[in-house]
Amino acid sequence: MIRLCIFDLDQTLVDTEDMKELREAGKNRTDAAYAGEVLAAFRSRARHLIDEMTLRMLLLTIPGLKLGVFTRSPRRYVDVVLAEAYASINWDIVIAYEDVQRYKPDGEGVHRSMIAVGMNDTDQLPYVLLVGDGDVDIKAAYNAGCRVALFKKGWPHSYQKTHWRSLSLLPDVVVGDQKEVQTCLQDPLPGLPYLERLLEAGMPATVKPRFDEIAKFFPGEKARHVVHAAGRYFTSCEALKYRREWHHLSQSIQNNKDAVIFPSEWIETIRSFIAFHYLILTSVLPFSGTGPELVITVIPARPDRPHRLAHLLAQLQASYGTNPRLNRLRLTFNPNVLGYRPGVQSQSHDHLKQEARFANVRDHLYVANPSEVQGKRFLVIDDVTTTGSTLLYAKKYLTDAGASSVDCFSLAQTVSDPLKYQ
């Protein structure tokens, strides 16, 4: 259960998109005239995205819950808006523009909020939730090391780039209304990506499993390619150290970087994705033969390295028994569909940037037996994806060889330094 819930203000607690210029003009202003302008503008229409009654119910139903606000808006503006919108709420901490030296996406405001309510240790970070509407909130939470809920109630019906960018950061939970916020505060685990929930809670999702669709692009192209991911991998950069410390999946991936026997949770996650993603194929009766076929393969190892994902694939195959199938869907496992030519570099160890990663894969990845690909359906699996270059070229080369369809799946999507690109 969450002990400290920190809300973003604008487009999270209240809808103030039309007050942007007035808000930005208020930095370091304390005069009554400015406060009057803010109050008049705020009263001009309905503003609540999360109403006062909801916050009062949170305090009544969650014993000991502390409430805070962390915003980049100026203090005078914040005080006026909160006094008008939430007159009966005694906020435990309010962090405004003037209160921090480093603004979002830095997590300084989260740490200040924790100290203000007596949560002084980093081992209490799993009990802190930041609720916000945009990518800057997610990055601030990642940098601070706490959980984050992406709040979409104030979003437009047609998403813009900023909204897709927020979703691509894979927040802990995505919520659409204030009722879902209450549910998340009581138990933040059900909304996690599938593999993360399995590792942290010890149980799979009881409703729709969460496998995120992450948009990937070839450099210079606008065509969107989907990679399905079951969780996140937080890198070892300094800006993510607090989140990485208690993130089960990041630890699991690190612990198994040289493994040949993999955690049962990894196998269960892949099985659940296959059952969920290919639900229609598993239930449709074939017109003839023994049912549709799905060829499951993995990203190859470099020529000088052990093919560890081949062991993952063998373990997955063994989990289905002697006749691998899912209802009517026949499952075929082949670790050698793809290969790398000599000279391929390590994407991570050689610290390749995005364009170099794509060029490296483009020039070295190949389909081992193109004649065996024609007309078949493929699922390509990787353990961790960053730019998506490996999975995207696997899909491209299999499609070029005549595959009828290719889906890409990764156990985890890399989360990189949240302070690097601002």
Regions found by a protein language model. Give the residues of each.
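Acidic, Mg2+-coordinating phosphoryl-transfer loop and its flanking beta/alpha structural elements
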Residues: 130-173
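Substrate-recognition "cap/lid" segment bordering the active-site pocket of phosphatases
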Residues: 75-129, 135
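Active-site-facing substrate-recognition patch
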Residues: 199-291, 311, 338-370, 416
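Short, acidic loop-to-helix structural element flanking the phosphoryl-transfer center
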Residues: 33, 39-69, 75-79, 107, ...
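A short, structured active-site edge motif that brings together acidic residues
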Residues: 89-105, 297-301, 327-344
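Active-site neighborhood of HAD-like aspartate-dependent phosphohydrolases
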Residues: 1-59
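PRPP/pyrophosphate-binding module of the type I phosphoribosyltransferase fold
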Residues: 139, 143-148, 155, 340-422
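PRPP-dependent phosphoribosyltransferase catalytic core
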Residues: 163-165, 170, 176-229, 392-422
